Design a protein with these regions (language model features):
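Generic C-terminus detector
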Residues: 283-322
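Nucleotidyltransferase catalytic core that binds NTPs
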Residues: 2-258, 264-266, 270, 299-300, ...
């Protein structure tokens, strides 16, 4: 009797899951000893788990850029330093096995899923990274210390994983800017790659916290992306910074159930608010609460100078005539 061929094991395609620093070092060393091509690189995607298609887009991009024999590491760590009093640290969704299966299909080689005592062996760190003034406005104003906590763990994970490339979503625009500044200001030898926001078909930006929304709240939350799209259209038509903000604010204010923390049009390299006469690239940012869920979103816009009023040249010429 012929024994049927055993189908390929899904387990064989799973990434190596490591929980300790020693296990991570072994995984890094094993890849180095495997003789990767000189064009292959090590890439890292840092997450807090509860992965969705937005995270998987980061992993797929990391797989593509690392090269066929490169090493893609996904970190899954709910960082307590990023949560303030009364925030959802205890209830933040966690599903390690489900997350591992998802990143396996996206091309991850290693999952580093440490516990807080592994990342912070001495408890809360005495020395932390400061986001400076970037961490004092917008998200920093509403979540004091959040960006400092994010930068501290990012720097630690960069040291632990030693990547050539690190991938971050553009949905967390202020955090991405802070990471870029930290890497540049502190001479960290890594290339930071921003990946565009992934949205559901209805426009809602993917977020692990979307799971908290009821069906009605989810429909209400669509006002965020709708306001950003409308603001971008006004910017492209020459409406000016004030009109961009007024249009976006009007949509948010008209939607019952949306409580806005901030709506701002900022310089994408500094997060400073742009002046009323600004033209050129800008970033339209919003943070709002729908029910008990806090959501953020943003849209890159190009503020076009308003068109010159018709007839101005003729009028000027007539006034100059004797």
């Amino acid at each position: 009797m012929t024994t049927p061929a055993t189908p390929p094991s899904e387990e064989a395609a799973r990434p190596t899951v490591v929980r300790t620093r020693a296990e991570l070092r072994d995984a890094l060393a094993a890849w180095a000893l495997s003789g990767p091509d000189v064009t292959d690189r090590r890439a890292v995607v840092m997450t807090m788990g509860a992965l969705h298609d937005g995270h998987l887009a980061l992993v797929r991009k990391a797989r593509e850029d690392a090269g066929p024999s490169g090493q893609v590491i996904v970190t899954i760590f709910v960082n307590p330093l990023q949560f303030g009093p009364g925030e959802d640290l205890a209830t933040y969704p966690r599903d390690l096995e489900g997350d591992v299966a998802k990143v396996a299909a996206a091309g991850a080689d290693v999952v580093f899923a440490p516990t807080p005592d592994i990342v912070y062996p001495d408890g809360d760190p005495v020395v932390r990274v400061s986001a400076g003034r970037i961490g004092e406005v917008l998200e920093g104003a509403f979540r004091p210390g959040h960006l400092d906590g994010a930068l501290t763990v990012v720097l630690k994970l960069l040291h632990l994983t030693r990547p050539d490339l690190a991938f971050f979503g553009q949905k967390d625009a202020q955090q991405l800017l802070a990471v870029r500044r930290m890497v540049r200001d502190l001479d960290v030898d890594v290339e930071i790659v921003g990946v565009p926001t992934v949205r559901d078909a209805d426009g809602l930006a993917l977020s692990s916290r979307n799971a908290y929304l009821s069906d009605d709240e989810r429909r209400t939350a669509l006002a965020l992306s709708r306001s950003l799209r409308s603001g971008a259209e006004v910017a492209a038509s020459g409406g000016g910074a004030r009109d961009v903000l007024a249009t976006a604010a009007g949509i948010l204010n008209d939607e019952d159930g949306v409580v806005v923390d901030y709506l701002a049009l900022v310089d994408p390299t500094t997060v400073d608010e742009v002046p009323a006469d600004h033209t050129g690239p800008a970033l339209l940012l919003v943070a709002a609460r729908v029910g008990t869920t806090r959501l953020i979103d943003n849209e890159a816009v190009d503020v076009v100078a308003p068109p010159e009023p018709e007839g101005d040249d003729d009028a000027a010429g007539q006034e100059a005539s004797p």
